[in-house]
Amino acid sequence: MPAVNLGMPKVPEVLAPRRKTRQISVGKVKVGGNAQVSVQSMTTTQTTNINATLQQIAELTATGCDIVRVAVPHQDDADVLHILAKKSQIPIIADIHFQPRYVFTAIDAGVGAVRVNPGNIRKFDDQVGAIAKAAKAAGVSIRIGVNAGSLHPSLLQKYGKATPEALVESAVWEASLFEEHDFHDFKISVKHNDPVIMVKAYRLLAERGDWPLHLGVTEAGPAFQGTIKSATAFGILLSEGIGDTIRVSLSAPPAEEVKVGLQILQSLNLRERKLEIVSCPSCGRAQVDVYSLAEQVTEGLKHVNVPLRVAVMGCVVNGPGEAREAELGVASGNGRGQIFVKGEVIKTVPEAEIVQTLIEEANRLAAEMPAGSIGSPEILV
């Protein structure tokens, strides 16, 4: 029976059509409508430290970040936004709490968008008209950022705690105020640190209007826990077509947030998949150290930036089948590895040469692809 090479699908399947929303602009990045789901992060530097902040933004840009948010807790931070907005490679969102005057400074600075928290900005409802007028004149969009940790006291009194309904009521009320002033260039987030409550809130919000939605699990936690929480919540919502831009919140370097966010989108076929390592979890049948093999191959191919699936399998049960379905793979056993390329065995090599052979073949395949970007290979054997 001839080998069937599945590899990367030519036309990726998605679980559900994207929800129809209005489209807004955050600087040069489109959000909502038919735009791809964008990935955001937030700097961890002191915003007034311009060089450090721009360096971190450059690192985020290189990682694949589309939009970056910076904290504006003080007037000094607001005063440097015009420099950051001018020099940043990607659009900047100014994150504003408590002080409404910082919103106007940010708009005048030329940022891509301003995030406002209706739960803690002083007399926010009274400021909406002026904010809408200034933002509209400057072509700056707004994010209405509702957060479970800073809901207005009246909503906490009404609902007893930060329920999905409380989050949505806050968001819809503020949206209605902006729309009363003929301002429609905004997106909404209703964040909670419990993925279940967060999912329920976004589902409710999606039913109430055509606003673009920014997905986030707030205060998700350390890298492992936060990744699980965000992947769970985002996976559910995005698979239902809900969500137009995402931020994975981790107690980790910002670039890690971007990597996780991109991987979530790639896993759902909402972004073109890049390098994908398929490796077995190992068991008593494994005849090689699969963990070490997979890690070495991953490290050695981290420079590859094309849709390439590489299977690293440790035995003959699923190994040959998985290897055939990848562009490149190895089925290991008895001190040797069968190397598959596009479904066909091209050679058998000693176990000690598996990693080097896979890296060499991956580089060759990547170079043949139109979007190939193979960088400088790093071989660990």
Swiss-Prot record:
EC number: 1.17.7.3
Gene3D superfamilies membership: Dihydropteroate synthase-like, Sulfite Reductase Hemoprotein, domain 1
UniProt catalytic activity: (2E)-4-hydroxy-3-methylbut-2-enyl diphosphate + oxidized [flavodoxin] + H2O + 2 H(+) = 2-C-methyl-D-erythritol 2,4-cyclic diphosphate + reduced [flavodoxin]
Top-level taxon of origin: Bacteria
SUPFAM superfamilies for this protein: Dihydropteroate synthetase-like, Nitrite and sulphite reductase 4Fe-4S domain-like
Binding residues for [4Fe-4S] cluster: 280, 283, 315, 322
Keyword Protein transport: no
Note accompanying the cofactor annotation: Binds 1 [4Fe-4S] cluster.
Biological processes, Gene Ontology terms: isopentenyl diphosphate biosynthetic process, methylerythritol 4-phosphate pathway; terpenoid biosynthetic process
Cofactor(s) demanded: [4Fe-4S] cluster
Any GO MF annotation of the entry: 4-hydroxy-3-methylbut-2-en-1-yl diphosphate synthase activity (ferredoxin)
Keywords carried by this UniProt record: 4Fe-4S, Iron, Iron-sulfur, Isoprene biosynthesis, Metal-binding, Oxidoreductase
Pathway: Isoprenoid biosynthesis; isopentenyl diphosphate biosynthesis via DXP pathway; isopentenyl diphosphate from 1-deoxy-D-xylulose 5-phosphate: step 5/6
NCBIfam families from the UniProt entry: ispG_gcpE (TIGR00612), PRK00366.1 (NF001540)
Protein family: Belongs to the IspG family.
Function: Converts 2C-methyl-D-erythritol 2,4-cyclodiphosphate (ME-2,4cPP) into 1-hydroxy-2-methyl-2-(E)-butenyl 4-diphosphate.
Protein name: 4-hydroxy-3-methylbut-2-en-1-yl diphosphate synthase (flavodoxin)
Organism of derivation: Clavibacter michiganensis subsp. michiganensis (strain NCPPB 382)
